[in-house]
Amino acid sequence: MNFSKSGLVAVSLAALVASGCSTSRFSSMDDQQPAPLQPAPAGQVTSNQLPPPASPGSTDPSKFPTAPANTQVASLPPDGQAPAGASDLSAAAVAGVWNASVSGQSCKIATPQTKFGAGFRAGPLHCPAPIDGIKSWNVAGKQLTLYDENGGSLARLYSSGGSKFDGQTSNGQPISLTR
């Protein structure tokens, strides 16, 4: 018996089509209907009166409350002065990924050694303002400075030893970088 290849292919396809039509896999989908939804509970909506607003004239909405007394705020020395014990920095020592803490909020900052503007490119990841605007960084002596897209300083930090930097943002928020 001599069978041609095309005849064998035709018989195989016919068998495949016939077997596909006889399956019951798809017929069971038509028989099952979803369970009916339970009706939402019927109830009555009630309303209450809002408390009356503060009496007019008792407070002036345009005035801020007085600042609390005896507050202690940590600060860095004025610009250009490094804290005692701060070490000289190099770009290689700063390059990498840092865990940043800005006023108690955490994020990550990447500081690769890719040249960008007057320093190196930087990339914040899920950072709060103003640190979310970091575009570059550079070191000068003992100081690490983080810059925005216009070259304005967003934060100045100094090495606190090991793999840690402490400083403050341009608006006075404390910031630290750790690895």
UniProtKB/Swiss-Prot annotation:
Location relative to the cell: Cell outer membrane
Q: Which InterPro entries match?
A: Inh/Omp19 (IPR021140), OM_lipoprot_Omp19_bac (IPR010571), Protease_inh_b-brl_dom (IPR016085)
Q: Name one GO molecular function term.
A: endopeptidase inhibitor activity
Has UniProt tagged this entry with the keyword Lipoprotein?
yes
Superkingdom, taxonomy of origin: Bacteria
Question: Where is the sequence biased in composition, kind Low complexity?
Answer: 32-44
Q: What is this protein called?
A: Outer membrane lipoprotein omp19 homolog
